Structures are given as C-alpha cells and as structure tokens.
C-alpha cells in the first residue's frame, strides 16, 4: 500500500504543477482512500486538498477541508467511511465504492 499511496501523491503533485486540478484531485482522492486509517497520511491528504482548493480558487473546497483535518486527527483510528473521497462536496460520513484497482489494498 505504501508504494500505491506514494505514487498517488507524486501524481497529484505533478498535476498540480501543471494546474490540472481535475487530475490532481483524482489522485488526492485515491490517496485519501488508501490513507484513511493512517492518521498522519490521512491528515496530510486533507491538508493537500485544502492547499489545492486554495490554489484553484475553490474556497468551498479549502474551507471544507478544515473540519476534515481536525476529524482525521481525532478519528482515523476509530472509524472512517470506507472509500470516501475526502472532498468537501461529499459528506464526511458517506461510504463510497473503493476503486477496483485499490480494493486489495484497503482493509
């Protein structure tokens, strides 16, 4: 899982450098699914989503990440909605389908 997570983060960074926000958020969402049970990584992805939202000028996304950052610190090890993308426009309590190519990596 570490390799898959790292690849998603690198791919998100590359897309952000090109200002390709759709691709960047897709990779951040996939990294989020992989990191949900790991407090540090989970929090890092929400931080990156906040920064990406600011860079894009999407203040709803950026502001929506603030409570998710707090929740990731407090609840990552207790409960997370499996497959949730982590985006501000999705309920933080909604379980979502895990992408098929990640299913074998997500507990």
Give residue ranges: language-model regions.
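Alpha-solenoid helical repeat scaffolds
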Residues: 42-47, 80-82
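TPR repeat positional signature
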Residues: 8, 46-49
């Amino acid at each position: 899982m570490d390799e898959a997570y790292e690849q998603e983060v690198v791919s998100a960074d590359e897309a952000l450098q090109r200002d390709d926000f759709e691709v960047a958020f897709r990779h951040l969402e996939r990294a989020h699914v992989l990191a949900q049970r790991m407090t540090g990584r989970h929090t890092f992805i929400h931080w990156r989503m906040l920064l990406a939202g600011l860079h894009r000028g999407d203040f709803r996304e950026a502001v929506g990440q603030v409570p998710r950052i707090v929740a990731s610190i407090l609840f990552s090890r207790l409960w997370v909605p499996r497959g949730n993308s982590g985006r501000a426009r999705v309920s933080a309590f909604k379980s979502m389908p895990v992408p098929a190519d990640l299913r074998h990596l997500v507990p």
